[in-house]
Amino acid sequence: LKNVNVSRQSIYNFIKRNCMEKVGPGIYISKDVLEDEAYVLSQRCPKGVISHDDALYYYGLVDREPFVHCITIYSGYNPSALTNSGYKVYTVKKELLDLGKTTITNQFGHEIPMYDLERTICDLVRSRRNFEIQDFNMAIKTYLQRSDKDLNRLMVYAKSFRIEKIIRQYMEVLL
């Protein structure tokens, strides 16, 4: 707002006058509006991609809304501000960060970066020790029943993450 000559004091007065609440650095919402935590997270970390539990829930692979919102960022990024705020942060090599990245419109009407279905399955398998076995199995089975699944894309992603063998084993057992 400095570019259009709006002073800090004017901004603070506007926030106070409109009873807004700070939800992140430079991010304010009206107190009578339900907070879109995934959107706030994507604004706090614009280079990150909403992932794991959030993506599983968005795609209907699990039926429980996540308790903790998840984001994936490149290795070397300092996630302490995000983890201190209660977010779960996953890291990948920089060259893998955009693999499977897409933009979705969530239930609040906000566009947020999120991984596609196949990348979400790869993340699930890579982080399988962090998931309850029932949720893990339900997500894999639900994915395999979907008409919009792309097993070829899944295997391309699996190769990039070096988890082809593991993915094949799950597919053989569950198909």
Give the residues covered by each predicted segment:
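A short acidic, leucine-rich amphipathic alpha-helix
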Residues: 1-2, 55
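Nucleic-acid-binding surface
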Residues: 15, 23, 27-175
